[in-house]
Structures are given as C-alpha cells and as structure tokens.
Curated annotation (Swiss-Prot):
The gene is rlmN. The keyword 4Fe-4S applies. GO terms for molecular function: 4 iron, 4 sulfur cluster binding; electron transfer activity; heme binding; metal ion binding; rRNA (adenine(2503)-C2-)-methyltransferase activity; rRNA binding; tRNA (adenine(37)-C2)-methyltransferase activity; tRNA binding. Keywords: 4Fe-4S, Cytoplasm, Disulfide bond, Iron, Iron-sulfur, Metal-binding, Methyltransferase, rRNA processing, S-adenosyl-L-methionine, Transferase, tRNA processing. Its EC number is 2.1.1.192. PROSITE patterns: RADICAL_SAM (PS51918). This is Dual-specificity RNA methyltransferase RlmN. Its cofactor is [4Fe-4S] cluster. It catalyses: adenosine(2503) in 23S rRNA + 2 reduced [2Fe-2S]-[ferredoxin] + 2 S-adenosyl-L-methionine = 2-methyladenosine(2503) in 23S rRNA + 5'-deoxyadenosine + L-methionine + 2 oxidized [2Fe-2S]-[ferredoxin] + S-adenosyl-L-homocysteine; adenosine(37) in tRNA + 2 reduced [2Fe-2S]-[ferredoxin] + 2 S-adenosyl-L-methionine = 2-methyladenosine(37) in tRNA + 5'-deoxyadenosine + L-methionine + 2 oxidized [2Fe-2S]-[ferredoxin] + S-adenosyl-L-homocysteine. Binds 1 [4Fe-4S] cluster. The cluster is coordinated with 3 cysteines and an exchangeable S-adenosyl-L-methionine. S-adenosyl-L-methionine binds at residues 206-207, 238, 260-262, 337.
Length: 406
C-alpha cells in the first residue's frame, strides 16, 4: 500500500527493493511476452491464452508477483518466477511538491553486466478532474535547447518501450491506481473519476521522435483497451521539430501532437531550439498542416515558453497568430521555470496576459500553464537526472528563484 507523503520539496529515499537480476516482463508487448513464454517451454497452442492472462495481470491489475495470478496454473507461475520477474525500475528518490506534484527519480537496470545503471525522471501532475504523467523517452537529450535544464545533460541512450511503459506502472503502483487497490490520498490528487493517471505526455527527458520506435511501441501498449486502456486522445507526444518523423507518427500511431515552438523567427529559434537549423519553421509548420491525426477535435498544441525581453512582445504574438493560419491549433503559454545557471528570466504577468489576449482575440485558445513542481525541479524544462547532481549552492539558488517567481 502506498503511504502518502506529506507535501515537501525535500527529497526522500523511497522504500523500494533493489533491481531484480531476473529479466522483467513488466512493460513488454504481446509479441515479447509470447517469446518469453516460448523460452520456458510453453506450448505454442497455449501461448495466446497465456499472453492474454499475463497482459490482464500486468497491465489491468498491476501485479508485481506471479503468485497474484490466480487463474494461471501453479506450475506455470513457478516456472515464470524461476526465470522472470515483474520488477519495475528502482525508485531512488520520490519528491512531493507543495502543490501535490510528484517526481520520481528512477534507476534503470544496466543493459550489460558491469555497466553503470542510468536514471530518468517521471513527473505526476494532479488536478481535480485528471492526473497527467509526464514520461521520459531518453536518458539525457541531444537537442541543447537554450532554456531547458535537460538539454545540459548529454544524451546517453534511448529508452526501450518497456522502460517507458514501466514509468507508468511505477506511478500507478505508488498511487494505488488499480482496481481493488487502496488509492493514495493527499493534497491535489484528483477527486473525480475512477483513475488517478488519466493522461500521458511525452514531455520528460529527451526528444521522443529521436526514440521513435520505442515511443510508438509504448503508445500501443498504453492504449490497449485490455490493459492500461489510455486512449490515444489522452496521449500526447511533444517534439522540438523532428520534421521527417511527424507525418510518420500521425500515420502509424496517431497520438495527440505538441510542438515545442518558442519562437516565430528562424534567427531566434535557431538559438532557443537549435534543431531549427536543420528543420526551419516553414518546414515544421508544413508538417503540422499535413499531420494525419490533426482535426478541429484533435488540435495540435504549440508550446511557447515566455522569456522576458526575448520572445514576449506584442509583435511576437501577432506573428504567432499569422504563423498558425491553416493549422487546427491551441497555444500553451508557459511561464519560464528557473534553474541554476540559466541566463533567462520569466516574462512578467502583465506581459504574458497581453500576449495571451492577442492570441485569444485571433480565435486561438491560449491558456497560460500554471507552473507545477517548481520547488522540486519538476516543472517544464527543469528535468535533469540526479546522476548529475546539483550542488547545495545551486539548490539554494533554485529555491530563491522559485520563490521570486511566485
């Protein structure tokens, strides 16, 4: 049972066992589960049924031990336990923000013996009527966006689909978000509906479209109605603009799309989002106009971080409106979230409101995203795995900046 933590920006070690040495079946798709069963001698004629049983227990019921699988024969349960586990990534640190946001630092199993395990972060953002889980797709990031903390951490590797799905399993474990489990209680958690994790956003560490195969496979697992059952309209993939993969994502997978735009001129976006040098704004916008999954009912979200004196003028707002012509879009204005060492500042609220008003009067929804989890470095642009630890001085600086931004 999950014992809810009191809201605090202080990190605490989570009471989770060390990583299993047996390969885990948690996070695998049906094909890989079938191969795992074949490897321990399950006859081919039984495999489809057994895969369906495993799928039900792992993804619908949240089983963490094969002994829980009461409709699976005792002999097979024993075989499974001898060769496999249902282990999740190790929770190294769990933090709870004053606003109820939760962040988990997760340690992944080493890919090869003797290799140093890598770490990623996942963030749960609760609201009254929903709970959004922000998942990572890479260890580190290669894009080096000027305002993003994750971009200061070098890219190590892509995550596997199983490692992406496992982030969702960890969150649901900790929140008691399975049928028959005692749900977590605490400040900010959803009070409506029967699920605590209702939406998934690929907005954590990494560029999802540079880990396309893993992300696509993970989405199919997450959306499967016999398991986790998170429909694709509740799954959003955010990209900084890997243009060749955008059409492919819409055609093959079909999730909601978000674009990390942040500038309306190539010269500025080249600085803020360096991938723009390879795929400039005109190419990016054309990919958005032809995105197969887009419609008035499934609008593309354009994320725009508000940087004081950089991209926040009325002229920028009008240029943004012009840029979005012909695209079913909404604009998400994001107050810049501070992190130690950054040279940028957040636009003041009057400037943000003027910018939002110009966009809104042009017919586009332009909500200003409420900063969540700033005090635990869980807000947009602040994620960076603790393998690259902040110094005490940097943490004090962060808290001062977060307090000043309130």
């Amino acid at each position: 049972m999950y014992a809810p933590m009191m809201p605090s920006p202080t990190a605490v070690a989570a009471p989770v066992a060390a990583l299993s040495i047996l390969p885990s079946l948690a996070g695998l798709d049906r094909e890989k589960l079938g191969l795992a069963l074949a490897a321990i001698g399950v006859p081919e004629r039984e495999r489809k049924m057994r895969v369906n049983q495993l799928w039900h227990w792992i993804y619908l019921r949240g089983a963490t031990d094969f002994a829980e699988m009461t409709n699976v024969s005792k002999t097979l349960r024993t075989q499974l336990a001898e060769h496999y586990s249902l282990a999740r990534p190790e929770i190294v640190v769990e933090q709870v923000s004053q606003d109820g946001t939760r962040k988990w630092l997760l340690r992944l199993p080493a890919e090869t013996p003797g290799e140093r395990p890598h770490e990623v972060e996942a963030v749960y953002i609760p609201e009254r009527d929903r709970g959004t889980l922000c998942v990572s797709s890479q260890v580190g990031c290669t894009l080096n966006c000027a305002f993003c903390h994750t971009g200061t951490q070098r890219l190590v590797r892509n995550l596997t689909a199983a490692e992406i799905v496992a982030q969702v399993l960890v969150a649901r474990d900790r929140l008691g978000d399975y049928p028959g489990r005692e749900r977590a209680v605490g400040p900010g958690l959803p009070t409506e509906g029967d699920r605590l994790v209702t939406n998934i956003v690929f907005m954590g560490m990494g560029e999802p479209l540079y880990a396309y195969d893993s992300v696509a496979e993970a989405i199919e697992i997450l959306a499967d109605g016999d398991g986790l059952g998170l429909g694709k309209r509740r799954i959003t993939v955010s990209t900084s603009g890997v243009v060749p993969e955008i059409e492919k994502l819409g055609r093959e997978v079909g999730p909601m799309l978000a674009i990390s735009l942040h500038a309306v001129r190539d010269d500025l976006r080249d600085v803020l989002v360096p991938i723009n040098k390879k795929y400039p704004i005109a190419e990016l916008m054309e990919a958005c106009r032809t995105y197969p999954a887009a419609s008035n009912a499934k609008r593309i979200t354009f994320e725009y971080v508000m940087l004081k004196g950089v991209n926040d003028s009325p002229a920028d707002a009008r240029a943004l409106v012009k840029l979005l012509e012909g695209v079913p879009a909404k604009i998400n204005l994001i107050p810049f979230n501070p992190w130690p060492g950054t040279k940028y500042e957040c636009s003041d609220w009057e400037t943000i409101e003027k910018f939002s008003d110009i966009v809104f009067r042009a017919g586009y929804a332009s909500p200003v995203r409420t900063p969540r989890g700033r005090d635990i470095l869980a807000a947009c642009g602040q994620l960076k795995s603790e393998t690259e630890k902040l110094s005490a001085r940097e943490r004090l600086a962060l808290r001062a900046m977060a307090a000043a931004a309130e």
